[in-house]
Amino acid sequence: MSNQILTEIHVDLDNRDKNTALFRVFLAFPVLIFLSSFSEFADNLPGVIGGFLVLPVVLSLLFRNVYPSYVLAFNKALLELSNRVSAYVLVLTDEYPSIEANQKVRLIYPEIEGGKKLSPWMPLVKWFLAIPLYLLGIVYAIYALILTFIAWLTVITKGHYPVERAEEVVKVIAYWNRLYGYALLLVTDEYPSFSLN
């Protein structure tokens, strides 16, 4: 099994709903508000970054070498929800993002054995080590947005999503998931690849 978060997104390629694709951002507004509600309190609570519980993980790994299972469950669920919303907004699927888990968008996490497989000192330097990954990730995100715009035009005019563009957009999402797993969720000590593959 990989030591990185694996991303599985089943893309709807054919028979796409042109009408919902045309107004996708507006249709996604309610679930975007729901998703953003997790980060609303992030400014007032130390250790919360974008809704993810980070400081409790850092402290528990540093002092006890334990990753609290309830924090892991929350962070997993929030990242999966974020991925379902991203898949919908980026026109990869016509299925409205469920606030519960589904099989269209699935993330597979590395086994951490309650934190025993993780170095207790790595959380202190991971954020610094991840800076080049974030910078490259911004370039990849722009690339994915350009591909999504082209694919969106294809969906609303022809009713299908080009396979090549879908694969590349999913690779960018997977890249960000690996980065989040390393630097934010702290579920791996293995440095993520700079490659999209």
Where do the language-model regions lie?
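Membrane-proximal intrinsically disordered regions of secretory-pathway and membrane-system proteins
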Residues: M1-N197
